[in-house]
């Protein structure tokens, strides 16, 4: 059936009365290496200023105050090549996606030398092998899922496939395509995939440098998609017959569930074009919600669009995000922990689950480990983080990228 376009002309006209210009054409999610500077060098965390509206906290400078909870960083694995995502297996082993197209196995906290799978990817810009997730019933079917930039008859597309790990864990075979023809560009490819508490697969996509696609429910770009483990559209999706679940996204790489029906979603803001920069954000979202891009990107309230919970005026940008559910750091319990790339820290955000308002936000590990890409809770109740220092935008150490455990 023909699906409605949720971008209303009335909303655009109202915004034109509020702002000086309409949103410009998109550029990269992060500044290229040659011109990139550290947000924290410009504004130390201890000197940040925040302003809170009725429903949105604006961090006007810096990233947030320095966190006061003592935490400890443990190196779990080194020698990885841009580890983009982690999928924990029932026995606590990890499958790790390396952006160049390799799936690796970490067994008993040791990186296995054998490559589990090599996927033919296009890793230009922000493409490549991105997210990875294990089937909820992995113990019986050995299925895992990957999001990657594929070459389809000479034209790149973003795709989600299902693979099956061998019993020995030394190899994997492709099973099927789950979602295909997700729009692709050099930048803004999204890429995070996770299974929700309902057993469905959620897929975060970018706007592929075409902001209008984020508001078009007929496009898979700039969305969070929701499909069954076999790639079918669930009957209770908000747009009939469509995998589209949440719209109005620029380039999400992180989301997690506060309850069965509510997600906290991080998103990249504008990249500096025509005077706009930063404005990375976290929003509280449910099925059918519109997070506003490109109609809104600040702490703005517009009818029919979700007002962000928090907006950082200076760029983070956010990578993976996880709600802390462990006991090792009890002060963090229930907080959203966001990995920051350019700003090189972990951001802790405390959001009231009832009102959606930010109660507290603070910075940890500032500059200690460089660029941080993924953040995910492990089955042991600990937080795991991947570094992204060898992605061409950081300083790649001799031991390459790492998986870190954040504990007490």
Label each region the model flagged.
Residues 18-20:
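C-terminal motif of bacterial Sec signal peptides marking the signal peptidase cleavage site
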Residues 22-24:
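Bacterial signal peptide processing site
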Residues 47-62, 127-129, 137-139, 207-362, ...:
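Beta-propeller domain segments
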Residues 59-81, 173-174, 308-309, 359-361:
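A short helix->beta-strand "capping" segment at the edge of beta-propeller domains
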Residues 75-81, 116-124, 179-185, 243-247, ...:
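Surface loop/turn motifs at the tips and blade-to-blade linkers of beta-strand repeat domains
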Residues 112-135:
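Blade-loop segments of beta-propeller domains
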């Amino acid at each position: 059936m023909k699906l409605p376009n949720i971008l209303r002309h009335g909303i655009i006209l109202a915004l034109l009365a509020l702002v000086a210009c309409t949103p410009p054409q998109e550029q990269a999610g992060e500044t290229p290496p040659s011109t990139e500077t550290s947000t924290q060098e410009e504004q130390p965390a201890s000197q940040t200023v925040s302003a809170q509206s009725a429903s949105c906290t604006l961090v006007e400078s810096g990233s947030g105050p320095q966190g006061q909870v003592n935490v400890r960083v443990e190196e779990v694995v080194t020698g990885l090549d841009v580890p983009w995502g982690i999928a924990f297996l029932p026995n606590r082993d990890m499958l790790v996606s390396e952006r160049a197209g390799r799936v690796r196995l970490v067994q008993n906290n040791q990186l296995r030398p054998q490559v589990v799978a090599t996927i033919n990817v296009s890793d230009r810009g922000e493409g490549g092998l991105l997210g990875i997730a294990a089937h909820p019933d992995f113990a019986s079917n050995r299925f895992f899922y990957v999001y990657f930039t594929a070459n389809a008859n000479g034209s790149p597309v973003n795709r989600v496939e299902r693979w099956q790990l061998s019993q020995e864990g030394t190899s994997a075979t492709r099973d099927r395509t789950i979602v295909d023809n997700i729009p692709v560009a050099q930048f803004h490819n999204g890429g995070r995939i996770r299974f929700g508490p309902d057993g469905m697969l959620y897929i975060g996509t970018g706007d592929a440098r075409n902001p209008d696609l984020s508001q078009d429910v007929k496009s898979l770009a700039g969305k969070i998609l929701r499909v069954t483990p076999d790639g079918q559209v669930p009957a209770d999706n908000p747009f009939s017959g469509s995998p589209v679940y949440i719209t109005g996204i620029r380039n999400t790489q992180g989301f997690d569930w506060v309850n069965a029906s509510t997600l906290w979603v991080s998103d990249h803001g504008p990249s500096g074009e025509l005077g706009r920069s930063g404005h990375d954000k976290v929003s509280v979202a449910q099925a059918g919600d519109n997070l506003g891009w490109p109609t809104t990107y600040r702490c703005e309230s517009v009818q029919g669009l979700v007002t962000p919970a928090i907006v950082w005026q200076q760029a983070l940008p956010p990578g993976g995000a996880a709600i802390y559910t462990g006991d090792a750091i009890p002060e963090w319990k229930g907080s959203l922990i966001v990995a920051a790339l350019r700003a090189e820290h972990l951001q802790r955000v405390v959001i009231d689950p009832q009102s959606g308002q930010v109660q507290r936000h603070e910075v940890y590990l500032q500059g200690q480990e460089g660029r941080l890409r993924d953040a995910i809770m492990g089955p042991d109740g600990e937080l795991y983080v991947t570094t992204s220092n060898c992605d061409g935008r950081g300083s790649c150490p001799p031991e390459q990228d790492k998986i870190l455990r954040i504990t007490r």
